Amino acid sequence: ILALEYLRKHSDQTIEVSDQAASQPKVHLGMQKGEVFYIKDLLYSLMLESHNDSAVAVAEHIGGSVEEFAEKMNRKAREIGCKNVCFVTPNGLDVADADGNEHSASAADMARIMRYCAFQSPCHETFLEITRTASRTIQDESGNRSFYLANHNALLSQCAEVLSGKTGFTGKAGYCYVAALKKEGKAFTVALLGCGWPPHKTYKWADMRKLDQYAFDTYNWYDIFDREKTFPEVEVRRGVKGTTALTLNLPSEKQTFLMLLRADEKPDIRYEYPTELEAPVHEGQEVGQAS
């Protein structure tokens, strides 16, 4: 998503492959040092096939180095609300930085990242276009070599509610899958980490189907504000009346405030308002907030 947002603001569309990018281990595209590729083609390579060399080539071009790009990743993750991430590489391999901090992210943060990519980023439509592509053939800029890419997200063709998804594997993390789901006006992001190790490559699909069904069966939209809620009257100093009533007053565009909840869940709403006001006080005056 950093690369897509970069492309919105910059005119350069191609990448020359470095020695470091070309020397990445499998799974890789097999690019060679000095070859030139279109950035967007390498994003298909990255998102459909998880090619390590494509990830490094894109990172070096946008960040100047893998290390600088990793810092951009960490900064972006914090901006969108992630709390437990430490990105060291653009391809997610099991490595540590110079201080010994291992490349890592929690399941909750991976779900937050997918939420941003699939629903919130200004480039979310392009992200979905790439990740929903079943297959694609790309070439280097010269047209001398062609590469066939196939999407490994099996649920795209099996479950209509699967909007996007990305598979992954490392020796420490096991088989992983992060997905965005949407159906009947409900949307969810789900992150599965450690869904088995070889040879159990298909466990993640069964686990995702269970969570998919659970989410749509269990969560429904509820209006979280109690329209009948009453508040204690507030003292008005130096006023004609000694006290005034408070009411919940939502803007017209938010007369309903819906949240996906289980039937047994109650939202934790905190009302903040003063215990006294100074005159003059006007009808409709905002004196507190709900959070």
What are the residue ranges of the model-derived segments?
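Active-site-adjacent loops and short helices of periplasmic peptidoglycan-processing enzymes
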Residues: 1-111, 118-121
